[in-house]
Amino acid sequence: MGKSPSSLDATIVAQAPCRVDLAGGTIDLWPLYLFHPGALTLNFAVNILTECRITPLRGKRIELRSLDTRKHEVFSSFDALMRARNYRLPLPARVIQFFAPKEGFLIETNSESPAGAGISGSSALMIAATAALARFTERHLTLEQMRVIAQNIEAQIINVPTGCQDYYPALYGGI
């Protein structure tokens, strides 16, 4: 099923806040929390946002652009993206692989959090990209489903287990 001409004009925007961790850190990783009954993590969302914007394109071309890192990649199709061995922008590329969109688009990301700042900018990016691509591919996901997708993809990319606490502020805000 292709996108209608009117939907080619519809840009999708998703934003997610970063977070500050006060206590608990990695105690939410399995099986660590099993060894510390009653342990809690405490963090809160901050007004430092990560944004993902998807603009439909005619044809099959997929463009990835990070405004904050000034990186850019272009693939002639989803199949070309799947065949690539390395990516300049691995986080959005892997989320795109998961959702397997049928149409071409431009995905632009921008984070107010500098890379390596320790406030879960990558987790916020994963949530924003997951939300935007879910809308673009017309998938109706719960917030918990988005968390599981983002968390598992990021763990695969960084080859390190990831806990839940980085993703909840990006999904729900607050403390």
Where are these regions (language model features)?
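Hydrophobic (often cysteine-bearing) scaffold residues that line and stabilize catalytic clefts
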Residues: 88, 126, 146
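Short, contiguous, pocket-lining structural segments
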Residues: 121, 125, 138, 142, ...
